[in-house]
Amino acid sequence: MTLIKSISGIRGTIGGPATENLTPLDIVKFTTAYVRFIAESAPGKRLKIVVGRDARISGEMVGDIIEGTLLGCGADVVNVGLCTTPGTELAVTAHRADGGIIITASLGLLGVLLNAFVPKNAFEIVM
C-alpha cells in the first residue's frame, strides 16, 4: 500500500520498500512535525501528548517509536496503551493534554496503520 498522507494523519503498510510503505523514519518525521504544530499554539509550554493504540501486531512497535520521538522533542507522554479511538480522544481531555496520537489499523488488514493526530479541541477524526 502506498503511503497516504492527509490532513488527519498518515496511512501505510509496515514493512517493505521504504518508498512505498510506512517506515520508522516516516513515523519519526510525522511525530516531530505534529509536536512542532502543537507547540506553535503554546510557545514555551512543556507539551503533554496522549498516545493510544489498538491490538495490531505492529502497534506496539509504532507506539514505542512515537513515544521515544515525543520524549526526544521534550513532550510529556501519557501512554493509555490499548484503547479505542474515542477512548484515546477522551483521554486527551481527561489528562488535560495538548493533543493525542491514535495508532490503529484501517480496514482490518494486518500491517496497515493509521496515525490520527488529535489536537486538544478536536471532536473526532475519521479517515
Residue ranges and their predicted role:
Residues 23, 84, 124-127:
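General structural signal for secondary-structure boundaries
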Residues 43-119:
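Ferredoxin-reductase
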Residues 1-68, 72-73:
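An N-terminal, well-structured beta->alpha segment
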Residues 2, 13, 111-127:
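Gly/Ser/Thr-enriched, mixed-charge loops and adjacent short helices
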